[in-house]
Swiss-Prot record:
InterPro entries: CEP19. GO terms for biological process: cilium assembly; microtubule anchoring at centrosome; vesicle targeting, trans-Golgi to periciliary membrane compartment. PANTHER family: CENTROSOMAL PROTEIN OF 19 KDA, CENTROSOMAL PROTEIN OF 19K CEP19. It comes from the Eukaryota. One of its GO terms (cellular component) is centriole. Required for ciliation. Recruits the RABL2B GTPase to the ciliary base to initiate ciliation. After specifically capturing the activated GTP-bound RABL2B, the CEP19-RABL2B complex binds intraflagellar transport (IFT) complex B from the large pool pre-docked at the base of the cilium and thus triggers its entry into the cilia. Involved in the early steps in cilia formation by recruiting the ciliary vesicles (CVs) to the distal end of the mother centriole where they fuse to initiate cilium assembly. Involved in microtubule (MT) anchoring at centrosomes. The gene is CEP19. This is Centrosomal protein of 19 kDa. Keywords: Cell projection, Cilium, Cilium biogenesis/degradation, Cytoplasm, Cytoskeleton.
Length: 163
């Protein structure tokens, strides 16, 4: 299917994913409504998003829509089924998709830890400077202020005496 996705959204009643796309051959904007079936407030959003994206009926239309965006839409739907407002659901999604630097990752279970690691990997890839970037500098020299007195630690002085 030759189409370009323009917008993707969700309808709560009856539950459906709505895609607005442009047909490249005719140049017309069209709307596709993909009903969400067998989805409850206990359903896994990532699994539901994968199933919808891999559905042969919708696959051609959802090629340009990221899996992460579909997961987010399903999270909105699940929040609505739990009775949360949109603001509460957005806040919950924000908490799930950001990393708290003060959080102790040793206390997380394996599934949550894998989720946090994937978020950190995405952030690293997004912030990483590559050679092709216009503001890439190979050798960065940083000057540290020497005004302050250097503090020594006990283990520094002990190891200096050994040598």
């Amino acid at each position: 299917m030759m189409c370009t996705a323009k917008k993707c959204g969700i309808r709560f009643q009856p539950p459906a994913i709505i895609l607005i796309y442009e047909n490249e051959i005719k140049g017309k904007s069209r709307q596709r409504i993909m009903p969400v079936r067998n989805f409850s407030k206990y359903s896994d959003c990532s699994r539901a998003a994968e199933q919808l994206k891999n559905n042969p009926r919708h696959k051609g239309y959802l090629e340009q829509v990221s899996l992460k965006q579909l997961e987010k839409l399903f999270s909105f739907l699940r929040g609505n089924l739990w009775g949360q407002s949109l603001a509460e659901t957005m806040e919950q999604i924000q908490r799930e998709t950001t990393i708290d630097p003060e959080e102790d990752l040793n206390k997380l279970d394996d599934k949550e830890l894998a989720k946090r690691k994937s978020i950190m990997d995405e952030l690293f890839e997004k912030n990483q400077k590559k050679k092709d970037d216009p503001n890439f500098v190979y050798d960065i020299e940083v000057e540290f202020p020497q005004d302050e007195q250097l503090q020594s630690c006990g283990w520094d002085t002990e190891s200096a005496e050994e040598f």
